[in-house]
């Protein structure tokens, strides 16, 4: 249970932990603490959800470690059905359960004696950005929300990239998924969809696939638990349940949207920013693409995140 894509900082401790969400699924997580943390006092804490199909040994662990270096208690977790977390079938995806995983992380952090449960914030990376925002709409224990390279998976599934999916194409997709349910039932196991990150890619690969492949399919970000695939029929739930319907209800708790200036996903952050109520901020990383915000510590604005959480978890 290792294969971390980054080295552990000498000033940080990392402890594997586990706990159950409200569905009884065991969540595997890593708790990061400053090595000199005074556990007799209560401290602010931040939970970090990984990119869609990512695991805690990748980008979310990098975020957790860097925030622990700056004095925060930080928790990186594997979503249900993925990584080292429990749940069957493997690699299923669910809007409700992935949102619940954030509240379960709050349950865990808020019951640690060294955590001030009134000062818990969260970071959602890529698809987890949408799940965290959705969780914060109803879970008021989450006092401050930041997203990095946010993607609204429900919008992507229902409308396609840049909302390009026509009504006819959507209906045809739903017909195919309905037939897939019959096939899964007869086979006794759900089929997986295509990889989001191609294993072999070159200059002829579509730019988004090439970008994901440059992270997930190379030594830069590869982890055996991050297969970048979900069960095919997972899309049906996302096509039926939009994640950000109540985003205005997060106010007056603050939201920080971070996106790469050159990211294909930038429009998700911009549109969510427009829909959200104050206080809110949109921070564009100059020259940054989508996966730059997964692991590039020279690009990820950790000083901005530290300022945001220090102010709003005071």
Task: Cite the ranges covered by each PLM segment.
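N-terminal cap/lid segment of alpha/beta-hydrolase-fold proteins
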Residues: 2-41, 294
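The serine-hydrolase catalytic nucleophile loop
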Residues: 53-65, 79
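Conserved alpha/beta-hydrolase
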Residues: 66-86
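Catalytic histidine-centered segment of alpha/beta-hydrolase-like enzymes
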Residues: 288-299
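Alpha/beta-hydrolase fold nucleophile elbow
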Residues: 113-126
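Short beta-strand/loop motif that positions the catalytic acidic residue
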Residues: 250, 256-259
């Amino acid at each position: 249970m290792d294969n971390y894509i980054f080295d552990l900082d000498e000033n940080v401790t990392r402890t594997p932990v586990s706990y159950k969400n409200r569905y009884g699924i065991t969540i595997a997580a890593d708790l990061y603490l400053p090595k000199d943390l005074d556990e007799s006092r209560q401290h602010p804490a931040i939970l970090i959800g990984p990119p869609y199909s990512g695991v805690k040994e990748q980008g979310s662990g990098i975020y957790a470690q860097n925030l622990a270096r700056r004095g925060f208690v930080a928790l990186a977790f594997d979503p249900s059905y993925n990584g080292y977390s429990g749940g069957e079938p493997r690699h299923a995806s669910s809007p409700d359960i992935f949102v619940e995983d954030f509240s379960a992380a709050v349950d865990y952090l808020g019951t640690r004696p060294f955590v001030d449960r009134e000062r818990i914030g969260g970071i959602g990376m890529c698809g987890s950005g949408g799940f965290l925002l959705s969780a914060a709409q109803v879970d008021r224990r989450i006092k401050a929300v930041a997203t990095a390279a946010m993607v609204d998976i429900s919008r992507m599934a229902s409308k396609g990239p840049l909302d390009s999916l026509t009504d006819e194409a959507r209906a045809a997709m739903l017909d195919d998924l309905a037939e897939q349910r019959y096939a899964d039932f007869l086979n006794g196991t759900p089929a997986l969809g295509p990889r989001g990150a191609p294993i072999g890619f070159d200059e002829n690969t579509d730019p988004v696939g090439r970008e994901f492949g440059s992270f997930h399919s190379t030594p830069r970000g590869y982890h055996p638990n991050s297969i970048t695939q979900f069960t095919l029929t997972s899309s049906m739930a996302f096509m039926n349940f939009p994640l950000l319907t109540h985003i205005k209800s997060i106010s007056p708790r603050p939201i920080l949207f971070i996106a790469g200036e050159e990211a294909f996903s930038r429009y998700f952050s911009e549109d969510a920013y427009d829909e959200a109520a104050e206080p809110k901020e949109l921070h564009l990383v100059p020259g940054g693409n989508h996966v730059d915000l997964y692991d590039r510590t020279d690009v990820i604005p950790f000083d901005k995140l530290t300022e945001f959480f220090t102010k709003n978890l005071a």
